[in-house]
Amino acid sequence: MNILKEEIHSSMQGLCDNVLELENVRFAGMISNFGNLYVGGFKDGITPYENDEARRSMYMKFALESNFRKDFDDSFGAFKYSTIQREKVSILTINICNYLLLVFVEPGVDLHALADRIQSIIDENESHDHNKQNLD
């Protein structure tokens, strides 16, 4: 891995780690446009509801849905985030550059407040990365 890729990977993993520290978060991961899990995973002690193969399929479906949403960017503006509420888990997807931050939380969590909190974490990380670049 070259230095730039290592820094991006480290920054994305740091973001996922910070999100996993939030209360009621089960999973935080960065998904590529092709549906591959780039970084992230489940919080320690959490048992996934689905097996590895089902999760890979799910990641791909989230990536495809995100790519289809781009068709409407000219009409509605850029996609920011979406929420899904299910019986066993709620899901938040946030578009970050060419990746999708996928977050699973326990049901009943205010997903809009969570999206705002995660956006502030993203902003803090970007500010930290920018300041680090200025020092280099």
For each predicted feature, which ranges?
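Non-catalytic interaction/Regulatory regions outside core domains
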Residues: 1-136
